[in-house]
């Protein structure tokens, strides 16, 4: 594939456009055009609230809405909405879909083009880079910690999980870094597309440890396909 005249479909589990994400990663895609769509596009707040997770409803996901706020959703409820938007992106000419979410999705999107799931990249790369050392994983919401511990515990020998919301203006990133340092982690994973390069740099500076940012990991890998 050549970057020139290629069309990439960027599919968020929240609402598009992701003005907090795409400007930071577009440079990795060369001349490729990026089309955006979101599972929650066109939904009212009441309809979005109806997607909230219930006890025992499976994995919990968090994403940004177009007004800058965020929503918490059950993965299972999102899948039909994602499928609809994936089909729309392909109908608009997308030759490759990129999911803007690090959730542990099954291979559920049925479209005629490749789909890149960031979680699969993370679970392939992080165990290699950690080399058995203690890894700190930061998730957006405390409701995700049990699933994060379970999922990452299957991939890593020694993991610590914590919550810090990338969409909340008053999140104390210095306190997050302090907790990670106290836990003696040797590698940090910011387990959400919503975390920014600025957050990565802040935590890296405060902990002195390498920090993996999913949005740029995803973009660099996709860039190799163009």
Question: Which positions does each model-derived feature cover?
Answer:
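A short, flexible N-terminal coil/short beta segment enriched in small residues
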Residues: 5, 37-44, 78-86, 119-143
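N-terminal glycine-rich anion-binding loop in soluble enzyme alpha/beta folds
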Residues: 2-73, 139-170
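Hydrophobic alpha-helical
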Residues: 96, 172-173, 186-207, 214, ...
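Short, flexible loop segments at boundaries between secondary-structure elements
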Residues: 42, 131-132, 167-169, 211-226
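A short, acidic, amphipathic alpha-helical segment used as a generic capping/interface helix at domain edges
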Residues: 82-85, 169-184
């Amino acid at each position: 594939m050549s970057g020139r005249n290629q069309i990439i479909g960027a599919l968020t589990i929240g609402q598009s456009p992701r003005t907090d994400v795409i400007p930071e990663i577009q440079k990795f895609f060369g001349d490729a055009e990026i089309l955006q769509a979101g599972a929650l596009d066109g939904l009212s707040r009441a309809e979005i609230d109806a997607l909230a997770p219930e006890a025992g409803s499976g994995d919990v996901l968090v994403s940004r809405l177009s007004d800058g706020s965020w929503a918490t959703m059950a993965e299972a409820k999102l899948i039909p909405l994602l499928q609809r938007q994936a089909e729309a992106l392909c109908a608009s000419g997308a030759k490759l879909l990129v999911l803007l979410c690090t959730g542990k999705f099954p291979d559920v999107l049925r479209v005629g083009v490749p789909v890149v799931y960031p979680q699969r990249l993370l679970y392939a790369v992080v165990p290699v880079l950690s080399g058995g050392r203690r890894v700190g994983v930061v998730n957006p919401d405390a409701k995700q910690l049990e699933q994060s511990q379970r999922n990452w515990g299957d991939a890593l020998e020694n993991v610590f999980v914590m919550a810090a919301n990338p969409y909340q203006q008053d999140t104390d990133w210095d306190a997050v870094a302090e907790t990670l340092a106290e836990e003696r982690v040797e590698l940090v994973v910011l387990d959400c597309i919503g975390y920014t390069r600025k957050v990565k740099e802040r935590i890296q500076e405060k902990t002195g440890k390498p920090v993996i940012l999913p949005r740029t990991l995803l973009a660099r890998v996709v860039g190799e396909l163009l």
